[in-house]
Amino acid sequence: MAEASSVNVGSGCAEKGPEELSQEPARPGTNISRVKLFDTMVDTFLQKLVAAGSFQRFTDCYKRFYQLQPEMTQRIYDKFVTQLQTSIQEEISEIKAEGNLEAVLIALDAIVEESKDRKEQAWRPSGIPEKDLRSAMAPYLLQQRDALQRRVQRQEAENRQLADAVLAGRRQLEELQLQAQARQQAWQALHREQKELLAVLKEPE
C-alpha cells in the first residue's frame, strides 16, 4: 500500500497535461505577443464558460429527462458545448478579420519594441492643466497660424495681381479716350476746313 501511494504521488508530480502547461505564467523578461495573449484569453474564457455550464448543472435543469435518458442527455450536452465553442470561436475569428485585429496587435508590439530603444523620456502630465494644455495646443496653434499666414500671403498676392490688372485696364481706357478725343478734334478741324473751302468757292467773281 505504501509503495502504491508513493508511485501515484510521483507520477502526479512528474507529468502535466497540455492545458496545465499552457496556463503556466510566463517567465519574467519574456515577451508574449499580443496576438498570442489574445488567443490565450479566448481559450481561457471558453474553458471557464464550459466549467460554469458543467454537466451537473445541465442535468439539474433537465432532471426528469436525465433520469429517463442519461446517455442521450450526455450526448446532447457534449454536442451543445461543442457547438457553443465553435460558434464563439467563429464569431471571434470574424471580428478579428473585420477589424484586422492581428495586424493591429502586431503593429502595437512593434511600436512598443521601438519605444524601448528611445532614450528620451515620454511625455508625462505636469499636474498643471493650463501648462499641459498650452504644451499640447501650442504646436497645433502655431501650425494653424502658419497656415493662415500662407493663406493671407496668397490672397494678398492675388489682390495685388487684380489691382495691377484694374490699373492696366484703366490706363488702356484712358488711352482709348484720348485717342477718341484726338480723332474727334481732327474730324472737327477737317469739317471746318471743308466749310471754309466751300465758302471760298461760292464767293462771286
From Swiss-Prot:
Entry-linked Pfam families: Nnf1
Stretches of the chain forming a coiled coil according to its record: 140-190
One of the record's GO cellular component terms: MIS12/MIND type complex
Region listing for Disordered, in residue ranges: 1-28
InterPro entries attached to this UniProt entry: PMF1/Nnf1
GO biological processes: cell division; chromosome segregation
Localization per Swiss-Prot or TrEMBL: Nucleus; Chromosome, Centromere, Kinetochore
Keywords of the record: Activator, Cell cycle, Cell division, Centromere, Chromosome, Chromosome partition, Coiled coil, Kinetochore, Mitosis, Nucleus, Transcription, Transcription regulation
Subunit description: Component of the MIS12 complex composed of MIS12, DSN1, NSL1 and PMF1. Interacts with COPS7A. Interacts via its coiled-coil domain with the leucine-zipper domain of NFE2L2. The interaction with NFE2L2 is required for the transcriptional regulation of SSAT.
Function: Part of the MIS12 complex which is required for normal chromosome alignment and segregation and kinetochore formation during mitosis. May act as a cotranscription partner of NFE2L2 involved in regulation of polyamine-induced transcription of SSAT.
Descriptive protein name: Polyamine-modulated factor 1
UniProt organism field: Bos taurus
Taxonomic lineage: Eukaryota, Metazoa, Chordata, Craniata, Vertebrata
Encoding gene, per UniProt annotation: PMF1
